[in-house]
């Protein structure tokens, strides 16, 4: 590996380099890359990246205990969209579902804390609407003037982000081989 890298003017850092078997898997740029017994190599969001994202969401909700629901939606939507778009290139649907559930639990605690004297049915009716056939959508209805309709702000779900696949590269193709210059 060092000879291959040195020919291209690159060096390996001994303290940062770790050689591991692909069956054990490794984390790289927030993804866990691992070969499974069925022979497939899958990339998933790593447990650490999922944990840190959930913690970021929890802290954002906790630090805005008195904020309106519309403010919460406006704060969280860019975070959810950005994280989801980064991790959409992999086997992420189960991870997205787990994180959606963690976000739901945090928002439910936020709503219960905000309205401690109200029943759980009242809280559900106020904050969790049924939109486009989907139940339990965290949403806020913004009241507008009489000449405009009220606006519904819905919290985005990671599960709604479509999973994409990268274009596969032929196994024998090598970017350093002049024969494949047209391929790359």
Predicted feature locations:
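Non-catalytic terminal/accessory segments
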Residues: 1-184
